[in-house]
Amino acid sequence: MDANQRTRANPFNMDEACRNCPALCETRTTVVHGYGDVGADFLFVGERPTPGADETGVPFVDFDGGEDGTEDGEDCGNDRKPGGAHSSDGLRRLLERLGLCDVTSPTDRPVLENVYLTNLTRCRDPARPPTDEEIDNCEPYLNAEIRMINPEVLIPVGERALAEIATEYTTTPADDLALAEAHATTIRGRGFALVPMIDPREQTDAQSQAWLEHFAQLMATDYRQTKGRRKR
């Protein structure tokens, strides 16, 4: 973690009482801003807070919502990987295998190294995905995080995040990028490399392994060469 950083949770002290989206204010538990290393090379962007994130304030955190792994009002397929793995086995497990998350750290306060986690939107409605207007309302938060962190690699997690990030940071039209084909590949963007990821809750074991292998290969390269190495 950056030597001058005091906290991993909402390190830029963004508005934790934001009311830009009235409908989401009625359904959220917590305003979920970014979490992690402000000197990170790798910035992960999801669509919206998970159920666990809404509870803890930490993006991508998730817990089993019940005996079948679901949360109220959502389809079982949204909370289990194919084959029955729960969503709590998702992104964190991948980061642990890459050496980017301390395996002994608490589920709701992961100790991340060189990683920052955030979302397109900061609040959750458990019954629906965010609207385009809600994503636009939250865009200044995301833009500020990307600008202040200045990562080397953006990892859009899921179809919606890929479309938004590709539109903003690449010259490739979003309609030309299908997540199934872009998963576990590197896309050169404007100032950033993109490595798209299917939501870990929806990945097959083969897709998870493919993404891990591709990202490990990327980490072994001089991926910082376009911006120069920064002191951490």
Where are the model-predicted features located?
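A polyanion-binding, active-site-adjacent surface
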Residues: D2-R232
